[in-house]
Amino acid sequence: MKTNLLNYDLQGLTRHFADMGEKPFRAKQVMRWMHQSGAQNFNEMTDLAKSLRHKLNEQAGIEIPKLMMSQKSSDGTRKWLLDVGTGNGVETVFIPESDRGTLCISSQVGCALECTFCSTGRQGFNRNLTAAEIIGQLWWANKAMGVTPKNERVISNVVMMGMGEPMANFDNVVTALSIMLDDHGYGLSRRRVTVSTSGMVPQMDRLRDVMPVALAVSLHASNDEVRNQIVPLNKKYPLKELMAACQRYLVKAPRDFITFEYVMLDGINDKAQHARELIELVTDVPCKFNLIPFNPFPNSGYERSSNENIRVFRDILQQAGFVVTVRKTRGDDIDAACGQLAGQVQDKTRRQQKWQQILIGQQG
């Protein structure tokens, strides 16, 4: 079986070429061809000796996930469904703005966590994505938009906020991050690459030590009682532990704050008292808040908070001195908004079946 070179960062690629009896600079050449020029064929790599190209064609490949579906929203947001084999597909979303272009990347086929307000969580879980399947989303997005990072940068920011919990696929995510940041890869700034987590505390500490990029925490609640219900991982890593991990992360973080993501659920976590509890909770954590109006999906059981409740919630936080943004919903007409990504998951957890049985019971 041929080796997929997209699975390697520069360090891994250098070792691979050493095993082939080649010099280290060859790894840099091939990495630039793959990621900066979008090459998918070794014969395109004209500064490699023909003998090396022949050897690579015999032993290796550049395997990119295949496109299953492409959609474009009325607001310019683009979504791609990529085939990762055995009936599974993952979704990648590009969000254009006047001052940046942000790509939202998936890390798993489905998600092993069961956040109750998230469409991905309802789909169950199949497997972790390989490093090639993660970085292949960035490769594909550039290709789909007709650009190469060497000549034109359309994607300025990457957020690991698509399908899956990135920290639960730690090693492959770190390899992909290494490629994103490498000057021979995509040359992105650590400040412009964000990993989102629901609060896997040990992995937060590991990421701080090996690949400190910007960090977003899917908080969504101001107390353990509510968070236990909507983010079950909280039962393992409660808020006190999570806040301590955030403080530790900031010691090496490229930004001097944590971004707390907070989905606004009507009647669940959107009252003035919740905002005041949040202020108390994050007293020792430099942070900003990103309030996310809930994006509905079929049979979710939740409603979006009213604009008035969101405004009051925001004002309480701002008056306490916090930077607060209310996320503008983008791409909801193509189910590309936050919490709507579902992809195509061959579930191994029986979670899809469980939710179907619950819905049938409710309808009966």
Curated annotation (Swiss-Prot):
Superkingdom of origin: Bacteria
EC number, as in UniProt: 2.1.1.192
Cofactor(s) the record lists: [4Fe-4S] cluster
GO terms, biological process: rRNA base methylation; tRNA methylation
Entry-linked SUPFAM superfamilies: Radical SAM enzymes (SSF102114)
Cofactor binding note of this UniProt entry: Binds 1 [4Fe-4S] cluster. The cluster is coordinated with 3 cysteines and an exchangeable S-adenosyl-L-methionine.
Active site, renumbered: 91, 338
Primary localization class, coarse: cytoplasm
Subcellular location(s) of the protein: Cytoplasm
Residues bound to [4Fe-4S] cluster: 111, 115, 118
Catalytic activity: adenosine(2503) in 23S rRNA + 2 reduced [2Fe-2S]-[ferredoxin] + 2 S-adenosyl-L-methionine = 2-methyladenosine(2503) in 23S rRNA + 5'-deoxyadenosine + L-methionine + 2 oxidized [2Fe-2S]-[ferredoxin] + S-adenosyl-L-homocysteine; adenosine(37) in tRNA + 2 reduced [2Fe-2S]-[ferredoxin] + 2 S-adenosyl-L-methionine = 2-methyladenosine(37) in tRNA + 5'-deoxyadenosine + L-methionine + 2 oxidized [2Fe-2S]-[ferredoxin] + S-adenosyl-L-homocysteine
GO molecular function, one term: tRNA (adenine(37)-C2)-methyltransferase activity
Stated family: Belongs to the radical SAM superfamily. RlmN family.
Known function: Specifically methylates position 2 of adenine 2503 in 23S rRNA and position 2 of adenine 37 in tRNAs. m2A2503 modification seems to play a crucial role in the proofreading step occurring at the peptidyl transferase center and thus would serve to optimize ribosomal fidelity.
Misc note: Reaction proceeds by a ping-pong mechanism involving intermediate methylation of a conserved cysteine residue.
HAMAP family: RNA_methyltr_RlmN
NCBIfam families, per database record: rRNA_mod_RlmN (TIGR00048)
Protein name: Dual-specificity RNA methyltransferase RlmN
Name of the gene this protein is made from: rlmN
